[in-house]
A protein has these predicted regions:
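Glycine-rich beta-strand-to-loop/alpha-helix junction loops that act as flexible
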Residues: 1-9, 28
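Conserved phosphate- and dinucleotide-binding cores of soluble alpha/beta proteins
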Residues: 7-16, 20, 33-234
Length: 234
């Protein structure tokens, strides 16, 4: 879980309070931010597949509508009642995203394995709107690239990229793009334009040199092979 995507909950909380919005449920890795929103009456039920902090642990103990669920109930693609398929929107992080909106949270930009992807691909596929949040450039490395090192979540399930330098919306959402351009002052770019902005800071990144030996596979939620993960060349 990316720190930015987790922290966004606090901004969502304030918007919900200002606009009088109430949510039927929130799910995923539960944090203290979501617990606060639940206890304030902003979220009716928390469906918890993983506690991310001690505030969430304490909430499970005392709040009857903070409900522990299994990974099957959370995101099994063969379970018609999976919570991931009932999401209106999801906010996710990324180590890389490319111009086809493919997302990588499996490996770093150097090809080293970061860890498991959790419900990243599941929630992106199930939600009506999948939003990726990330710094465009971090420590002279761009999160936006021509092609991700490893595909974790396919781009056809991703809708929006939000960065500190601007927002890119998948071109299939023409109505959303037009609405935001007409009614807001948000910086809306094509994803190719955002990539050019990133490269103006970082230059053209060097390609990762991979060895021939496959050490792991990135699989989609249905078991489809998305990408081989190769040993980093020495």
């Amino acid at each position: 879980a990316g720190g930015i995507s987790l922290a966004v909950a606090d901004f969502v909380r304030q918007e919900m309070k200002d606009r009088g919005i109430r949510a039927g449920f929130a799910s995923g890795g539960i944090t203290g931010y979501l617990v606060d929103m639940h206890e304030e009456g902003l979220i009716d039920t928390l469906y918890d597949v993983q506690c991310f902090d001690l505030a969430a642990v304490e909430s499970v103990r005392k709040n009857p509508k903070h409900v522990k669920i299994t990974a099957d109930r959370y995101a099994n693609p063969d379970n018609p009642e999976a919570v991931a398929g009932q999401l209106d929107f999801v906010i996710l992080g990324a180590s890389e995203i490319d111009t086809d909106y493919n997302v990588n949270v499996t490996t770093g930009s150097d090809g080293s394995i970061l860890g498991g992807s959790g419900g990243h691909a599941d929630t992106a596929a199930g939600a009506k709107l999948a939003i990726i949040v990330s710094k465009l450039v971090n420590a002279r490395v761009s999160c936006l690239v021509d092609r991700v090192t490893t595909v974790t979540t396919p781009g056809d399930t991703v809708d929006v990229l939000v960065t500190e330098r601007g927002i890119a919306i998948h071109p299939r959402h023409t109505n959303l793009i037009e609405k935001l351009k007409e009614e807001t002052n948000l910086e809306i770019f094509t994803i190719e334009e955002l990539l050019d902005i990133a490269k103006s800071f970082t230059g053209q990144p060097r390609a990762v040199t991979r060895g021939e030996r496959v050490v792991a596979h990135s699989l989609y939620r249905d078991g489809t092979l998305l990408d081989p993960i190769c040993r980093i060349a020495e």
